[in-house]
Protein backbone atom coordinates (compact mmCIF):
# COMPACT_ATOMS: atom_id res chain seq x y z
CA UNK A 1 0.00 0.00 0.00
CA UNK A 2 1.37 3.43 -0.96
CA UNK A 3 1.89 6.31 1.35
CA UNK A 4 -0.81 8.38 -0.43
CA UNK A 5 -3.39 5.64 -0.10
CA UNK A 6 -2.54 5.17 3.56
CA UNK A 7 -2.97 8.87 4.15
CA UNK A 8 -6.35 8.83 2.46
CA UNK A 9 -7.48 5.89 4.49
CA UNK A 10 -6.27 7.44 7.69
CA UNK A 11 -7.92 10.81 6.92
CA UNK A 12 -11.30 9.39 5.75
CA UNK A 13 -13.78 8.82 8.58
CA UNK A 14 -15.36 5.34 8.66
CA UNK A 15 -19.17 5.47 9.38
CA UNK A 16 -21.61 2.73 10.14
CA UNK A 17 -23.91 1.23 7.55
CA UNK A 18 -26.95 3.13 8.81
CA UNK A 19 -25.19 6.45 8.63
CA UNK A 20 -23.94 5.77 5.11
CA UNK A 21 -27.48 5.00 3.95
CA UNK A 22 -29.03 7.98 5.71
CA UNK A 23 -26.60 10.66 4.50
CA UNK A 24 -25.81 11.38 0.88
CA UNK A 25 -23.14 14.05 1.71
CA UNK A 26 -19.56 13.46 0.40
CA UNK A 27 -16.88 12.20 2.78
CA UNK A 28 -14.44 14.61 4.31
CA UNK A 29 -11.12 14.96 2.48
CA UNK A 30 -8.01 17.08 2.85
CA UNK A 31 -8.96 18.95 -0.27
CA UNK A 32 -12.36 19.84 1.28
CA UNK A 33 -10.66 20.95 4.51
CA UNK A 34 -8.37 23.20 2.51
CA UNK A 35 -11.24 24.85 0.63
CA UNK A 36 -12.50 27.26 3.18
CA UNK A 37 -13.50 30.87 3.00
CA UNK A 38 -10.67 33.38 3.02
CA UNK A 39 -9.73 34.30 6.56
CA UNK A 40 -11.70 31.42 8.16
CA UNK A 41 -10.42 28.39 9.96
CA UNK A 42 -10.42 25.10 8.04
CA UNK A 43 -13.22 22.59 9.04
CA UNK A 44 -11.97 19.48 10.66
CA UNK A 45 -13.24 16.02 9.95
CA UNK A 46 -14.73 15.73 13.41
CA UNK A 47 -16.73 18.94 13.02
CA UNK A 48 -18.00 17.91 9.63
CA UNK A 49 -19.05 14.54 10.97
CA UNK A 50 -20.90 16.17 13.84
CA UNK A 51 -22.83 18.41 11.46
CA UNK A 52 -23.86 15.43 9.35
CA UNK A 53 -25.08 13.57 12.40
CA UNK A 54 -27.18 16.53 13.50
CA UNK A 55 -28.73 16.83 10.00
CA UNK A 56 -29.53 13.13 9.95
CA UNK A 57 -31.20 13.38 13.34
CA UNK A 58 -33.23 16.40 12.23
CA UNK A 59 -34.45 14.57 9.13
CA UNK A 60 -35.45 11.57 11.21
CA UNK A 61 -37.32 13.86 13.61
CA UNK A 62 -39.11 15.54 10.69
CA UNK A 63 -40.18 12.21 9.21
CA UNK A 64 -41.43 11.04 12.58
CA UNK A 65 -43.44 14.23 13.10
CA UNK A 66 -44.95 13.90 9.60
CA UNK A 67 -46.08 10.38 10.41
CA UNK A 68 -47.57 11.56 13.68
CA UNK A 69 -49.40 14.43 11.94
CA UNK A 70 -50.86 12.06 9.36
CA UNK A 71 -51.94 9.66 12.06
CA UNK A 72 -53.49 12.49 14.06
CA UNK A 73 -55.39 13.69 10.96
CA UNK A 74 -56.79 10.22 10.33
CA UNK A 75 -57.82 9.93 13.98
CA UNK A 76 -59.44 13.36 13.78
CA UNK A 77 -61.44 12.35 10.68
CA UNK A 78 -62.67 9.18 12.33
CA UNK A 79 -63.53 11.16 15.43
CA UNK A 80 -65.58 13.65 13.38
CA UNK A 81 -67.46 10.79 11.72
CA UNK A 82 -68.13 9.18 15.06
CA UNK A 83 -69.37 12.46 16.55
CA UNK A 84 -71.64 13.08 13.54
CA UNK A 85 -73.11 9.60 13.77
CA UNK A 86 -73.57 9.97 17.50
CA UNK A 87 -75.29 13.32 17.01
CA UNK A 88 -77.70 11.77 14.50
CA UNK A 89 -78.48 8.97 16.92
CA UNK A 90 -79.04 11.47 19.72
CA UNK A 91 -81.46 13.45 17.54
CA UNK A 92 -83.38 10.29 16.70
CA UNK A 93 -83.56 9.33 20.34
CA UNK A 94 -84.71 12.83 21.23
CA UNK A 95 -87.42 12.76 18.56
CA UNK A 96 -88.53 9.31 19.62
CA UNK A 97 -88.63 10.42 23.23
CA UNK A 98 -90.68 13.47 22.29
CA UNK A 99 -93.16 11.30 20.40
CA UNK A 100 -93.46 8.95 23.32
CA UNK A 101 -94.07 11.80 25.71
CA UNK A 102 -96.48 13.77 23.39
CA UNK A 103 -100.08 12.55 23.61
CA UNK A 104 -101.85 11.44 20.40
CA UNK A 105 -103.75 14.09 18.41
CA UNK A 106 -107.38 13.46 17.58
CA UNK A 107 -108.84 14.57 14.26
CA UNK A 108 -112.07 16.45 13.68
CA UNK A 109 -113.97 17.73 10.65
CA UNK A 110 -114.82 21.42 10.58
CA UNK A 111 -118.52 22.18 10.21
CA UNK A 112 -118.46 25.95 10.77
CA UNK A 113 -115.89 28.67 11.54
CA UNK A 114 -116.66 31.59 13.85
CA UNK A 115 -114.17 34.44 14.10
CA UNK A 116 -114.92 36.04 17.47
CA UNK A 117 -113.95 39.21 19.29
CA UNK A 118 -113.06 40.43 22.78
CA UNK A 119 -116.04 40.43 25.13
CA UNK A 120 -117.41 43.82 26.14
CA UNK A 121 -119.32 44.86 29.24
CA UNK A 122 -122.44 45.27 27.14
CA UNK A 123 -122.21 41.65 25.99
CA UNK A 124 -121.69 40.49 29.57
CA UNK A 125 -124.74 42.50 30.59
CA UNK A 126 -126.69 40.78 27.81
CA UNK A 127 -125.79 37.39 29.35
CA UNK A 128 -123.49 36.49 26.48
CA UNK A 129 -121.07 33.65 27.13
CA UNK A 130 -117.52 33.20 25.84
CA UNK A 131 -118.77 30.27 23.78
CA UNK A 132 -120.85 32.73 21.77
CA UNK A 133 -118.31 35.56 21.49
CA UNK A 134 -114.85 33.99 21.30
CA UNK A 135 -113.25 32.44 18.24
CA UNK A 136 -114.36 28.83 17.91
CA UNK A 137 -114.91 25.96 15.52
CA UNK A 138 -117.95 23.75 15.24
CA UNK A 139 -116.53 20.31 14.53
CA UNK A 140 -117.56 16.69 14.49
CA UNK A 141 -115.41 14.29 16.50
CA UNK A 142 -116.19 10.59 16.52
CA UNK A 143 -119.79 11.25 15.58
CA UNK A 144 -120.28 14.00 18.20
CA UNK A 145 -120.83 17.68 17.55
CA UNK A 146 -118.43 19.88 19.54
CA UNK A 147 -117.52 23.55 19.79
CA UNK A 148 -113.77 23.90 20.39
CA UNK A 149 -111.24 26.74 20.72
CA UNK A 150 -108.61 27.47 18.09
CA UNK A 151 -104.88 27.87 18.62
CA UNK A 152 -103.66 31.40 17.85
CA UNK A 153 -101.03 29.81 15.60
CA UNK A 154 -103.74 28.83 13.08
CA UNK A 155 -104.76 31.40 10.49
CA UNK A 156 -108.55 31.47 10.61
CA UNK A 157 -108.77 32.75 7.03
CA UNK A 158 -107.45 29.39 5.81
CA UNK A 159 -110.12 27.36 7.62
CA UNK A 160 -113.25 26.35 5.71
CA UNK A 161 -116.01 23.81 6.38
CA UNK A 162 -115.01 20.31 5.41
CA UNK A 163 -111.35 20.64 6.40
CA UNK A 164 -109.75 18.28 8.92
CA UNK A 165 -108.10 19.73 12.06
CA UNK A 166 -105.96 18.04 14.70
CA UNK A 167 -106.83 18.47 18.39
CA UNK A 168 -104.43 18.39 21.34
CA UNK A 169 -105.14 16.89 24.75
CA UNK A 170 -107.06 20.05 25.67
CA UNK A 171 -109.37 19.62 22.64
CA UNK A 172 -107.93 22.69 20.98
CA UNK A 173 -107.41 22.87 17.22
CA UNK A 174 -103.64 23.08 16.69
CA UNK A 175 -103.14 22.08 13.03
CA UNK A 176 -105.26 22.40 9.88
CA UNK A 177 -105.26 19.77 7.12
CA UNK A 178 -106.87 19.71 3.68
CA UNK A 179 -110.36 18.50 2.82
CA UNK A 180 -110.51 14.78 2.10
CA UNK A 181 -111.94 14.27 -1.42
CA UNK A 182 -113.30 10.81 -0.58
CA UNK A 183 -116.76 9.46 0.05
CA UNK A 184 -119.84 8.03 -1.60
CA UNK A 185 -120.65 9.26 -5.11
CA UNK A 186 -124.08 10.92 -5.28
CA UNK A 187 -125.89 12.95 -7.93
CA UNK A 188 -126.99 16.55 -7.53
CA UNK A 189 -130.75 16.83 -7.86
CA UNK A 190 -131.29 20.48 -6.90
CA UNK A 191 -129.33 23.35 -5.35
CA UNK A 192 -131.56 24.59 -2.52
CA UNK A 193 -129.56 27.59 -1.30
CA UNK A 194 -125.98 28.73 -0.70
CA UNK A 195 -125.30 25.98 1.83
CA UNK A 196 -127.68 23.12 1.04
CA UNK A 197 -127.99 20.76 -1.91
CA UNK A 198 -130.54 18.02 -2.54
CA UNK A 199 -128.79 14.86 -3.77
CA UNK A 200 -129.80 11.39 -4.96
CA UNK A 201 -127.90 8.51 -3.38
CA UNK A 202 -127.05 5.20 -5.00
CA UNK A 203 -129.88 3.52 -3.08
CA UNK A 204 -132.44 5.85 -4.66
CA UNK A 205 -133.02 7.88 -1.50
CA UNK A 206 -132.72 11.66 -1.33
CA UNK A 207 -130.67 13.63 1.18
CA UNK A 208 -130.07 17.27 1.96
CA UNK A 209 -126.32 17.82 2.28
CA UNK A 210 -124.18 20.79 3.26
CA UNK A 211 -121.39 22.00 0.98
CA UNK A 212 -117.71 22.08 1.92
CA UNK A 213 -115.71 25.25 1.44
CA UNK A 214 -113.54 23.55 -1.18
CA UNK A 215 -116.56 23.06 -3.47
CA UNK A 216 -117.94 25.97 -5.48
CA UNK A 217 -121.70 25.68 -5.16
CA UNK A 218 -122.24 28.08 -8.07
CA UNK A 219 -120.71 25.53 -10.45
CA UNK A 220 -122.96 22.68 -9.35
CA UNK A 221 -125.58 21.63 -11.88
CA UNK A 222 -128.35 19.08 -11.81
CA UNK A 223 -126.89 15.70 -12.70
CA UNK A 224 -123.35 16.46 -11.50
CA UNK A 225 -121.60 13.68 -9.58
CA UNK A 226 -120.11 14.72 -6.22
CA UNK A 227 -118.56 12.95 -3.22
CA UNK A 228 -120.58 12.82 0.00
CA UNK A 229 -118.92 12.41 3.41
CA UNK A 230 -121.56 10.29 5.12
CA UNK A 231 -120.20 11.15 8.59
CA UNK A 232 -120.99 14.84 8.25
CA UNK A 233 -123.40 14.76 5.26
CA UNK A 234 -121.13 17.20 3.51
CA UNK A 235 -120.31 17.38 -0.20
CA UNK A 236 -116.53 17.60 -0.44
CA UNK A 237 -115.55 17.46 -4.13
CA UNK A 238 -116.88 17.18 -7.66
CA UNK A 239 -116.31 13.97 -9.57
CA UNK A 240 -115.07 14.32 -13.18
CA UNK A 241 -117.63 13.83 -15.91
CA UNK A 242 -118.66 10.25 -16.46
CA UNK A 243 -118.27 8.44 -19.75
CA UNK A 244 -121.82 9.26 -20.79
CA UNK A 245 -121.40 12.94 -19.90
CA UNK A 246 -118.21 13.11 -21.95
CA UNK A 247 -120.13 11.68 -24.89
CA UNK A 248 -122.71 14.45 -24.84
CA UNK A 249 -120.34 17.39 -24.52
CA UNK A 250 -119.03 17.17 -28.06
CA UNK A 251 -118.85 20.52 -29.79
CA UNK A 252 -120.19 21.29 -33.20
CA UNK A 253 -118.67 19.28 -36.10
CA UNK A 254 -117.31 20.89 -39.26
CA UNK A 255 -119.35 18.84 -41.77
CA UNK A 256 -121.38 20.87 -44.26
CA UNK A 257 -124.14 19.95 -46.68
CA UNK A 258 -121.71 20.51 -49.56
CA UNK A 259 -119.66 17.54 -48.34
CA UNK A 260 -122.61 15.17 -48.79
CA UNK A 261 -123.25 13.86 -52.28
CA UNK A 262 -126.22 12.19 -53.91
CA UNK A 263 -128.78 13.22 -51.26
CA UNK A 264 -130.01 16.56 -52.52
CA UNK A 265 -133.73 15.83 -52.07
CA UNK A 266 -133.31 14.48 -48.54
CA UNK A 267 -131.12 17.40 -47.51
CA UNK A 268 -133.73 19.86 -48.77
CA UNK A 269 -136.40 18.13 -46.68
CA UNK A 270 -134.27 18.32 -43.56
CA UNK A 271 -133.34 21.96 -44.06
CA UNK A 272 -136.98 22.91 -44.52
CA UNK A 273 -137.99 21.03 -41.38
CA UNK A 274 -135.15 22.12 -39.12
CA UNK A 275 -133.78 25.47 -40.25
CA UNK A 276 -136.95 27.31 -41.25
CA UNK A 277 -138.56 27.14 -37.78
CA UNK A 278 -135.32 28.34 -36.24
CA UNK A 279 -134.81 31.20 -38.70
CA UNK A 280 -138.44 32.37 -38.76
CA UNK A 281 -140.04 31.40 -35.44
CA UNK A 282 -142.52 34.30 -35.55
CA UNK A 283 -144.05 33.07 -38.82
CA UNK A 284 -144.48 29.56 -37.44
CA UNK A 285 -146.11 31.02 -34.32
CA UNK A 286 -148.60 32.94 -36.47
CA UNK A 287 -149.60 29.70 -38.16
CA UNK A 288 -149.64 27.85 -34.80
CA UNK A 289 -147.19 25.36 -36.26
CA UNK A 290 -144.74 23.81 -33.83
CA UNK A 291 -141.32 22.87 -35.16
CA UNK A 292 -140.52 19.15 -35.27
CA UNK A 293 -138.99 17.75 -32.12
CA UNK A 294 -137.35 14.80 -33.80
CA UNK A 295 -136.20 13.39 -37.12
CA UNK A 296 -135.62 9.75 -37.98
CA UNK A 297 -133.07 8.96 -40.69
CA UNK A 298 -133.39 5.36 -41.79
CA UNK A 299 -132.04 3.28 -44.61
CA UNK A 300 -129.16 0.96 -45.47
CA UNK A 301 -125.83 1.59 -43.75
CA UNK A 302 -123.03 3.69 -45.18
CA UNK A 303 -125.15 6.27 -46.98
CA UNK A 304 -124.54 9.41 -44.95
CA UNK A 305 -127.06 9.40 -42.08
CA UNK A 306 -124.45 10.44 -39.52
CA UNK A 307 -122.98 13.05 -41.87
CA UNK A 308 -126.43 14.57 -42.40
CA UNK A 309 -126.95 14.88 -38.64
CA UNK A 310 -123.57 16.59 -38.27
CA UNK A 311 -124.34 18.92 -41.17
CA UNK A 312 -127.66 19.86 -39.51
CA UNK A 313 -125.83 20.77 -36.30
CA UNK A 314 -123.21 22.76 -38.20
CA UNK A 315 -125.83 24.61 -40.22
CA UNK A 316 -127.87 25.48 -37.10
CA UNK A 317 -124.75 26.81 -35.39
CA UNK A 318 -123.89 28.97 -38.39
CA UNK A 319 -127.45 30.31 -38.56
CA UNK A 320 -127.43 31.08 -34.83
CA UNK A 321 -124.15 32.97 -35.11
CA UNK A 322 -125.52 34.97 -38.06
CA UNK A 323 -128.69 35.89 -36.17
CA UNK A 324 -126.73 36.93 -33.07
CA UNK A 325 -123.54 38.61 -34.31
CA UNK A 326 -120.98 39.33 -31.63
CA UNK A 327 -122.50 36.89 -29.15
CA UNK A 328 -120.98 33.68 -27.84
CA UNK A 329 -123.70 31.56 -29.45
CA UNK A 330 -122.40 28.23 -30.67
CA UNK A 331 -123.89 24.90 -31.65
CA UNK A 332 -123.53 21.57 -29.88
CA UNK A 333 -123.75 18.10 -31.36
CA UNK A 334 -124.51 15.45 -28.75
CA UNK A 335 -123.41 12.29 -30.53
CA UNK A 336 -124.84 9.29 -28.67
CA UNK A 337 -123.87 5.83 -29.88
CA UNK A 338 -126.61 3.54 -28.66
CA UNK A 339 -124.61 0.48 -27.53
CA UNK A 340 -122.27 2.63 -25.44
CA UNK A 341 -125.14 3.60 -23.14
CA UNK A 342 -126.15 0.04 -22.34
CA UNK A 343 -125.17 -0.97 -18.83
CA UNK A 344 -125.54 -4.19 -16.87
CA UNK A 345 -126.90 -2.35 -13.81
CA UNK A 346 -130.63 -1.71 -13.71
CA UNK A 347 -131.47 1.97 -14.08
CA UNK A 348 -127.98 3.04 -15.15
CA UNK A 349 -128.88 3.43 -18.82
CA UNK A 350 -131.93 5.48 -17.89
CA UNK A 351 -129.77 7.73 -15.73
CA UNK A 352 -127.37 8.31 -18.60
CA UNK A 353 -130.26 9.25 -20.89
CA UNK A 354 -131.41 11.77 -18.27
CA UNK A 355 -127.88 13.19 -18.12
CA UNK A 356 -127.88 13.62 -21.89
CA UNK A 357 -131.06 15.67 -21.92
CA UNK A 358 -130.00 17.65 -18.85
CA UNK A 359 -126.89 18.72 -20.77
CA UNK A 360 -129.04 19.52 -23.81
CA UNK A 361 -131.39 21.69 -21.77
CA UNK A 362 -128.50 23.59 -20.17
CA UNK A 363 -127.01 24.46 -23.56
CA UNK A 364 -130.40 25.32 -25.06
CA UNK A 365 -131.36 27.62 -22.19
CA UNK A 366 -128.17 29.57 -22.88
CA UNK A 367 -129.34 30.15 -26.46
CA UNK A 368 -127.19 27.51 -28.15
CA UNK A 369 -128.81 25.23 -30.75
CA UNK A 370 -128.38 21.60 -29.73
CA UNK A 371 -128.70 18.46 -31.83
CA UNK A 372 -129.09 15.20 -29.87
CA UNK A 373 -128.10 12.44 -32.29
CA UNK A 374 -128.81 8.78 -31.46
CA UNK A 375 -126.84 6.50 -33.75
CA UNK A 376 -127.85 2.83 -34.02
CA UNK A 377 -131.16 3.78 -32.45
CA UNK A 378 -132.60 0.26 -32.65
CA UNK A 379 -130.03 -0.98 -30.14
CA UNK A 380 -131.54 1.18 -27.38
CA UNK A 381 -135.19 1.66 -28.19
CA UNK A 382 -136.35 -1.72 -29.44
CA UNK A 383 -140.00 -2.64 -29.69
CA UNK A 384 -141.30 -3.56 -26.24
CA UNK A 385 -142.70 -7.06 -25.80
CA UNK A 386 -141.24 -8.31 -29.05
CA UNK A 387 -139.40 -11.14 -27.33
CA UNK A 388 -136.29 -10.35 -29.39
CA UNK A 389 -134.24 -9.15 -26.44
CA UNK A 390 -134.01 -9.24 -22.64
CA UNK A 391 -136.85 -6.68 -22.35
CA UNK A 392 -134.45 -4.07 -20.97
CA UNK A 393 -136.18 -1.63 -23.31
CA UNK A 394 -139.32 -1.73 -21.14
CA UNK A 395 -137.76 0.99 -18.99
CA UNK A 396 -135.39 2.62 -21.50
CA UNK A 397 -138.10 3.48 -24.04
CA UNK A 398 -140.37 5.23 -21.50
CA UNK A 399 -137.39 7.25 -20.27
CA UNK A 400 -136.68 8.50 -23.79
CA UNK A 401 -140.35 9.28 -24.37
CA UNK A 402 -140.49 11.32 -21.19
CA UNK A 403 -137.37 13.25 -22.15
CA UNK A 404 -138.56 13.95 -25.70
CA UNK A 405 -141.90 15.17 -24.39
CA UNK A 406 -140.00 17.36 -21.94
CA UNK A 407 -138.17 19.05 -24.79
CA UNK A 408 -141.47 20.50 -25.99
CA UNK A 409 -140.92 23.85 -24.27
CA UNK A 410 -137.40 24.25 -25.63
CA UNK A 411 -136.82 26.03 -28.91
CA UNK A 412 -133.22 25.06 -29.55
CA UNK A 413 -133.18 21.25 -29.17
CA UNK A 414 -133.86 18.70 -31.87
CA UNK A 415 -133.51 14.93 -31.62
CA UNK A 416 -132.20 13.02 -34.65
CA UNK A 417 -132.17 9.24 -34.75
CA UNK A 418 -130.38 7.04 -37.27
CA UNK A 419 -131.04 3.37 -37.91
CA UNK A 420 -130.89 0.76 -40.64
CA UNK A 421 -133.53 -1.41 -38.91
CA UNK A 422 -136.46 0.92 -38.38
CA UNK A 423 -138.75 -2.11 -38.04
CA UNK A 424 -137.16 -2.91 -34.66
CA UNK A 425 -137.80 0.51 -33.07
CA UNK A 426 -140.75 0.82 -30.70
CA UNK A 427 -143.85 2.34 -32.29
CA UNK A 428 -144.24 4.87 -29.46
CA UNK A 429 -140.91 6.41 -30.43
CA UNK A 430 -141.87 6.55 -34.10
CA UNK A 431 -145.26 8.19 -33.71
CA UNK A 432 -145.84 11.82 -34.74
CA UNK A 433 -145.13 14.33 -32.01
CA UNK A 434 -141.87 12.65 -31.08
CA UNK A 435 -140.01 11.78 -34.26
CA UNK A 436 -142.19 13.89 -36.53
CA UNK A 437 -140.15 13.65 -39.71
CA UNK A 438 -139.05 10.32 -41.14
CA UNK A 439 -136.65 10.47 -44.07
CA UNK A 440 -135.35 7.44 -45.89
CA UNK A 441 -131.71 7.72 -46.95
CA UNK A 442 -131.61 5.52 -50.03
CA UNK A 443 -128.61 4.11 -51.81
CA UNK A 444 -127.29 6.50 -54.47
CA UNK A 445 -128.22 6.03 -58.09
CA UNK A 446 -125.72 6.47 -60.94
CA UNK A 447 -126.00 10.26 -60.87
CA UNK A 448 -125.65 10.36 -57.10
CA UNK A 449 -122.66 8.03 -57.25
CA UNK A 450 -120.97 10.33 -59.77
CA UNK A 451 -121.54 13.22 -57.38
CA UNK A 452 -119.98 11.24 -54.52
CA UNK A 453 -117.04 10.23 -56.71
CA UNK A 454 -116.50 13.93 -57.38
CA UNK A 455 -116.16 14.64 -53.65
CA UNK A 456 -113.22 12.23 -53.35
CA UNK A 457 -111.60 12.70 -56.77
CA UNK A 458 -110.45 16.33 -56.81
CA UNK A 459 -108.20 18.32 -59.11
CA UNK A 460 -105.37 18.53 -56.58
CA UNK A 461 -104.75 14.78 -56.80
CA UNK A 462 -102.00 13.42 -59.09
CA UNK A 463 -103.74 12.13 -62.21
CA UNK A 464 -102.49 10.06 -65.10
CA UNK A 465 -100.70 12.53 -67.40
CA UNK A 466 -101.73 10.63 -70.54
CA UNK A 467 -105.43 10.86 -69.72
CA UNK A 468 -105.16 14.54 -68.76
CA UNK A 469 -103.46 15.30 -72.08
CA UNK A 470 -106.07 13.34 -74.02
CA UNK A 471 -108.97 15.08 -72.24
CA UNK A 472 -107.44 18.52 -72.59
CA UNK A 473 -107.73 19.53 -68.93
CA UNK A 474 -107.68 18.09 -65.45
CA UNK A 475 -111.40 18.78 -64.93
CA UNK A 476 -112.31 17.00 -68.17
CA UNK A 477 -110.10 14.03 -67.29
CA UNK A 478 -111.77 13.72 -63.87
CA UNK A 479 -115.23 13.89 -65.44
CA UNK A 480 -114.33 11.07 -67.83
CA UNK A 481 -112.85 8.94 -65.04
CA UNK A 482 -115.91 9.43 -62.82
CA UNK A 483 -118.29 8.60 -65.66
CA UNK A 484 -116.38 5.40 -66.43
CA UNK A 485 -116.28 4.33 -62.78
CA UNK A 486 -119.98 5.07 -62.18
CA UNK A 487 -120.92 3.31 -65.42
CA UNK A 488 -118.96 0.22 -64.42
CA UNK A 489 -120.45 0.26 -60.92
CA UNK A 490 -124.06 0.44 -62.15
CA UNK A 491 -123.71 -1.72 -65.25
CA UNK A 492 -126.35 -4.47 -65.37
CA UNK A 493 -124.50 -7.19 -67.23
CA UNK A 494 -123.83 -10.83 -66.36
CA UNK A 495 -120.31 -9.89 -65.27
CA UNK A 496 -121.64 -7.40 -62.70
CA UNK A 497 -124.31 -9.71 -61.23
CA UNK A 498 -123.82 -9.98 -57.48
CA UNK A 499 -126.59 -12.22 -56.10
CA UNK A 500 -129.64 -14.16 -57.24
CA UNK A 501 -132.63 -14.07 -54.88
CA UNK A 502 -135.61 -16.42 -54.96
CA UNK A 503 -138.84 -14.84 -53.73
CA UNK A 504 -142.18 -16.45 -52.95
CA UNK A 505 -144.76 -13.82 -53.87
CA UNK A 506 -147.62 -16.04 -52.73
CA UNK A 507 -146.86 -14.98 -49.16
CA UNK A 508 -148.04 -11.46 -49.99
CA UNK A 509 -151.12 -10.51 -48.04
CA UNK A 510 -154.21 -11.00 -50.19
CA UNK A 511 -152.60 -13.46 -52.57
CA UNK A 512 -154.46 -16.73 -52.91
CA UNK A 513 -151.74 -18.62 -54.75
CA UNK A 514 -150.14 -21.55 -52.98
CA UNK A 515 -146.67 -20.92 -54.34
CA UNK A 516 -145.32 -18.42 -56.80
CA UNK A 517 -141.52 -18.53 -56.89
CA UNK A 518 -139.54 -16.04 -58.92
CA UNK A 519 -135.85 -15.26 -59.20
CA UNK A 520 -134.37 -11.81 -59.27
CA UNK A 521 -130.80 -10.92 -60.12
CA UNK A 522 -129.23 -8.22 -58.03
CA UNK A 523 -126.24 -6.28 -59.37
CA UNK A 524 -123.36 -4.38 -57.82
CA UNK A 525 -125.13 -1.08 -58.12
CA UNK A 526 -127.97 -2.40 -55.94
CA UNK A 527 -125.52 -2.52 -53.01
CA UNK A 528 -123.57 0.67 -53.69
CA UNK A 529 -123.29 3.26 -50.95
CA UNK A 530 -121.26 6.30 -50.08
CA UNK A 531 -118.95 4.16 -47.95
CA UNK A 532 -118.46 1.69 -50.82
CA UNK A 533 -117.60 4.51 -53.24
CA UNK A 534 -115.06 5.91 -50.80
CA UNK A 535 -113.44 2.46 -50.55
CA UNK A 536 -113.29 2.25 -54.34
CA UNK A 537 -111.48 5.59 -54.54
CA UNK A 538 -109.07 4.55 -51.78
CA UNK A 539 -108.28 1.31 -53.63
CA UNK A 540 -107.56 3.30 -56.80
CA UNK A 541 -105.23 5.65 -54.91
CA UNK A 542 -103.31 2.72 -53.42
CA UNK A 543 -102.93 1.13 -56.86
CA UNK A 544 -101.58 4.40 -58.31
CA UNK A 545 -99.13 4.77 -55.41
CA UNK A 546 -97.89 1.21 -55.92
CA UNK A 547 -97.42 1.84 -59.65
CA UNK A 548 -95.44 5.02 -58.94
CA UNK A 549 -93.17 3.21 -56.46
CA UNK A 550 -92.49 0.49 -59.00
CA UNK A 551 -91.51 3.12 -61.58
CA UNK A 552 -89.15 4.77 -59.11
CA UNK A 553 -87.57 1.41 -58.25
CA UNK A 554 -86.99 0.68 -61.93
CA UNK A 555 -85.39 4.10 -62.42
CA UNK A 556 -88.09 5.26 -64.85
CA UNK A 557 -89.77 8.66 -64.95
CA UNK A 558 -92.62 8.56 -62.42
CA UNK A 559 -93.81 12.14 -62.91
CA UNK A 560 -96.56 11.08 -65.33
CA UNK A 561 -97.94 8.36 -63.06
CA UNK A 562 -101.22 9.11 -61.28
CA UNK A 563 -104.77 7.95 -60.76
CA UNK A 564 -106.26 6.71 -64.01
CA UNK A 565 -109.42 5.12 -65.30
CA UNK A 566 -107.81 1.68 -65.18
CA UNK A 567 -107.24 2.06 -61.44
CA UNK A 568 -110.87 3.00 -60.79
CA UNK A 569 -112.30 0.17 -62.90
CA UNK A 570 -110.04 -2.36 -61.21
CA UNK A 571 -111.05 -0.95 -57.82
CA UNK A 572 -114.75 -1.38 -58.65
CA UNK A 573 -114.15 -5.01 -59.58
CA UNK A 574 -112.01 -5.73 -56.53
CA UNK A 575 -114.41 -4.05 -54.10
CA UNK A 576 -117.13 -6.61 -54.84
CA UNK A 577 -115.22 -9.69 -55.98
CA UNK A 578 -112.95 -9.68 -52.94
CA UNK A 579 -116.01 -10.18 -50.74
CA UNK A 580 -116.41 -13.93 -50.42
CA UNK A 581 -119.71 -13.88 -48.54
CA UNK A 582 -122.99 -12.75 -49.97
CA UNK A 583 -124.56 -9.52 -48.71
CA UNK A 584 -126.49 -9.83 -45.42
CA UNK A 585 -130.17 -10.65 -45.70
CA UNK A 586 -131.39 -7.19 -44.57
CA UNK A 587 -129.42 -5.60 -47.42
CA UNK A 588 -130.88 -8.08 -49.93
CA UNK A 589 -134.41 -7.50 -48.65
CA UNK A 590 -133.85 -3.76 -48.87
CA UNK A 591 -132.59 -4.04 -52.46
CA UNK A 592 -135.63 -6.13 -53.41
CA UNK A 593 -137.96 -3.59 -51.78
CA UNK A 594 -136.36 -0.74 -53.72
CA UNK A 595 -136.79 -2.78 -56.92
CA UNK A 596 -140.51 -3.20 -56.14
CA UNK A 597 -140.34 -6.93 -55.40
CA UNK A 598 -142.70 -8.12 -52.67
CA UNK A 599 -142.80 -11.51 -51.04
CA UNK A 600 -140.93 -13.88 -48.77
CA UNK A 601 -137.24 -14.33 -49.43
CA UNK A 602 -136.70 -18.04 -49.95
CA UNK A 603 -133.01 -18.28 -50.85
CA UNK A 604 -130.01 -16.29 -51.99
CA UNK A 605 -127.30 -17.72 -54.23
CA UNK A 606 -124.25 -16.29 -55.96
CA UNK A 607 -124.60 -15.77 -59.72
CA UNK A 608 -123.46 -18.58 -61.96
Curated annotation (Swiss-Prot):
Coiled coil start-end: 45-79
GO molecular function: ATP binding; ATP hydrolysis activity
GO cellular component: proteasome complex
Residue stretches spanning the membrane: none
Keywords tagged on the record: ATP-binding, Coiled coil, Nucleotide-binding
InterPro entries: AAA+_ATPase, AAA_ATPase_domain, ATPase_AAA_core, ATPase_AAA_CS, NA-bd_OB-fold, P-loop_NTPase, Prot_ATP_ID_OB_2nd, Prot_ATP_ID_OB_N
HAMAP family membership: ARC_ATPase
Subunit structure: Homohexamer. Assembles into a hexameric ring structure.
Name recorded for this polypeptide: AAA ATPase forming ring-shaped complexes
